[in-house]
């Protein structure tokens, strides 16, 4: 998909394609459509990030709360989004043994209790051995810095999902903006 | 459900229950959870409305763009949310004859083209005869005032959905705020 195609989309198509760039937050894609045309992947991505950065703290926490636990209830029940299912699978989180899964559930619960949002991590940049270590480490962080870290992970996930959709075309098919 | 119960919910439960108060915008419910405890339905509702009002214009348009057309593609394909299905059914929009449905589709398309968001109306406060008349009327409005009208309809829908969930209990079970 190239940017000429992206810039020609009506809002219905745009939300169909980009609605889950930020997990379960089609509102953000639907808002970003207002900023078209986009000059390339980076420009499009920057509009997603600017929207996130401009939200009040409750809204930023709200974004995090729309994310599933890693190796959590949604994975067990088969109710993950397609994107999250693929990402957790690539990190090996869909094939944990019972002990590792219970250990992660316990850490996830502690994290949710401490910060009021779930542990968010770009799973594709991690693996089954690293996830619980990183979770245990971030559990010790201060709430203010942890919110920033978690939003940084949301942006990494968004970048990877946008790259999946736009791939190499996004750089080669830059369009002239008016 | 009374407010004691609502105020005791963790964010996962809260988003499960209130995630579609604003159509397909669980981000808003997830943000509102930060404002607990709530003294009653009106207080809870005001936090939803305050979040909507504080969004930049693109975000407000984004909320509208997460709504389906009335008697549109999602209804035909069976992909409406449960709440929207019920509301459109109560307004008689699920049993239109072909001529009426095509007329509405045509008006919806004109409206989306003119304003850049879909026609949003609290269907439960309307009926199959009124919907196309109101759509044709609002199609003539100025974009600025039409955005305000449409967000007012989002709030009416949210109010009705909250009342469905909280009903009479919400007034009788007020809790003391700290």
From Swiss-Prot, chains A, B:
Pfam families documented for this protein: OHCU_decarbox
Catalytic reactions on record: 5-hydroxy-2-oxo-4-ureido-2,5-dihydro-1H-imidazole-5-carboxylate + H(+) = (S)-allantoin + CO2
EC top class, as a word: lyase
Annotated InterPro entries: OHCU_decarboxylase, OHCU_decarboxylase-1, OHCU_decarboxylase_sf
Localization (cell): Peroxisome
Record-linked Gene3D superfamilies: Oxo-4-hydroxy-4-carboxy-5-ureidoimidazoline decarboxylase (1.10.3330.10)
Annotated positions binding substrate: 68, 84-88, 119-123
Protein name as it appears in the record: 2-oxo-4-hydroxy-4-carboxy-5-ureidoimidazoline decarboxylase
Biological classification of the source: Eukaryota, Metazoa, Chordata, Craniata, Vertebrata
């Amino acid at each position: 998909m190239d940017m000429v195609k992206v810039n020609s989309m009506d809002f219905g198509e745009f939300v169909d394609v980009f609605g889950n760039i930020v997990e379960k937050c089609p509102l953000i894609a639907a808002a970003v459509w207002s900023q078209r045309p986009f000059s390339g992947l980076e420009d499009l991505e920057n509009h997603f990030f600017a929207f996130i950065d401009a939200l009040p703290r409750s809204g930023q926490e709200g974004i995090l709360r729309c994310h599933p636990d890693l190796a959590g209830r949604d994975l067990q029940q088969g109710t993950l989004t397609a994107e999250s299912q693929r990402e957790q699978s690539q990190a090996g989180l869909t094939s944990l043994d019972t002990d590792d899964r219970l250990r992660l559930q316990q850490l996830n619960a502690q994290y949710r209790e401490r910060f009021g949002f779930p542990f968010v991590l770009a799973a594709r940049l991690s693996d089954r051995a690293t996830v619980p270590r990183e979770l245990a480490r971030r559990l010790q962080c201060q709430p203010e810095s942890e919110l920033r870290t978690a939003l940084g992970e949301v942006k990494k996930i968004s970048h990877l999902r946008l790259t999946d959709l736009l791939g190499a075309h996004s750089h080669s098919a830059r369009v002239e903006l008016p």
